[in-house]
């Protein structure tokens, strides 16, 4: 906490140099960059605490998001799913790659036996857990469960392999950590052109 306070103090004392220090600050404290950019956008819009004039910011329209469901016992997962449905979620996100893959597939099959794709959209997040030697086979197996998309199936900085995965179209791919750890816009645009993911 002291480190972020110290960095925030340094940024505030050097705010006139924001454009030249922003990238360096982002590498260590992306939350500070988010805060400063939000404050600057608010200032640009007259300081009315409304960054964008949209139906969402006016409170007239919601943003559909997914409900996160944690892997666990079948009864635990079913309870979570029922809670998410009762809260109005039609889309859930499940983290994969942390426990035995066969068990994960069994749990996803269990979910699908209770909720078809029309009742519940399933998105997966692998957090880079799959390896080059198993990613295609694992995604092929997961695709049987009518999966909407998978976030970051492999670890970052494997652009050629990630491009192959996206081109294979076993299921749609969304980037996650790949975007977080790529700081400058030029590299980010090059990466997006090289990989061509279905979602970012």
Placement of each model-derived feature along the sequence:
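N-terminal capping/lid subdomain adjacent to the active-site entrance of alpha/beta enzymes
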Residues: 1-122, 127-129, 136, 140-144
